[in-house]
């Protein structure tokens, strides 16, 4: 067992803060319309030029073990914020660092970390209430274009594309981003479905960067029972392998020999496959399997109707143009089913919605109707170079997530102004507190200025002057960093989704509070490498 190095109190906090500061300093340059880039060396291949906060955070790994602890906690913060809303990673990192650095200074001076945390929590609740109060619903296409454009680093073409996609499939619709075979970026809406079940094993991953299993033009096997015995699956696997096409298996569960065989064949390149659990439970699972069957043109292999897996043929399998599965969701793109049968199924579900008396059943039926009828918007990204295509795909992912978040909870003025307008609510909370709890609220109040200050500094303006002037102003009058003028930010299209700002703030306070409460660090002491001496009879003469 490796020995541990233990640091306590100020020594531990200083190291944690140092690591967090290094990551925050690398990420902060990516905030705002005048953002800069970070050049990242890869272990293989060419270096990458990146201005995406979460991508920079994922590459962060420091030599000093204690400093690395602080950096890795902030990295988790960026990843969590990105996973939830797809944007706001740089903002959450900057907020967390501002809270942590101010908090550490107060703890070293003798403040109670527990009381500081209580103050931070009180201030956060007041700030979030203020953000929700100033939110404006997103209804028009123009507003969606504004949100998507800002999130895509002011790329208007991406803003237009994302707004078109959301207009076609709705705020809850599925939007897939693929690589184009040409240099053009195009939008297409195809039949498809997304459900909340992911791959059963990470060995099915084909795209390591995005942690996804992607199957092109696969067969789709649907089964309403567990698959465990290898002998049941082998005949069908042999038929699919001969066809040269990938295979998606959707069943109640896939386990034991059957799952192991799929993984081994995947690793050896014999048969490209992915296995996922069927969505839903009980009778609802059977209904959803039938929905997928009609969409893909498959037949559900069910012993209830006399079908067994051992005798299944390729004719009983469905088809899809593309399947994308991650650890949580699976998306079927392109339908192999008959349009007439799909329309009939939609009509049947609508009749069931009209007849049901249960609100819960109605809600679930409406979900099925939306999944089956909504389709999938496919954005095919084209670019002259691989690096440009990757950057464009990342920008599209951010823009899609931000725009969906805006549709869900509304928008607020961007450029860090929304957090500055929440300062007044936090100040009221501050007046109701005392002692170290009040200090915690003050720390949050000061931290709320950090994003606006950083956006100004990234555009070569004086951050302190800009923040002071924005605080003096009213409404949505703020600093347009791209033109270095004070304008009505909402009218100028500089807006942020409430959900992104709220999530960034909540996650930042949560992570900073955890680090402030840390009294010790434990890291492994690397064992010295021992040089192996050659045997006497093998010594070089």
From Swiss-Prot:
ATP binds at residues 30-33, 415, 496. It catalyses: ATP + H2O + a folded polypeptide = ADP + phosphate + an unfolded polypeptide. One of its GO terms (cellular component) is GroEL-GroES complex. Keywords: ATP-binding, Chaperone, Cytoplasm, Isomerase, Nucleotide-binding. Its EC number is 5.6.1.7. It is found in: Cytoplasm. SUPFAM superfamilies: GroEL apical domain-like, GroEL equatorial domain-like, GroEL-intermediate domain like. It is an enzyme of class 5 (isomerase). It comes from the Bacteria. One of its GO terms (molecular function) is isomerase activity. One of its GO terms (biological process) is response to heat. The keyword Acetylation does not apply. Together with its co-chaperonin GroES, plays an essential role in assisting protein folding. The GroEL-GroES system forms a nano-cage that allows encapsulation of the non-native substrate proteins and provides a physical environment optimized to promote and accelerate protein folding. Belongs to the chaperonin (HSP60) family. Forms a cylinder of 14 subunits composed of two heptameric rings stacked back-to-back. Interacts with the co-chaperonin GroES. This is Chaperonin GroEL 5. It comes from Bradyrhizobium diazoefficiens (strain JCM 10833 / BCRC 13528 / IAM 13628 / NBRC 14792 / USDA 110). The gene is groEL5.
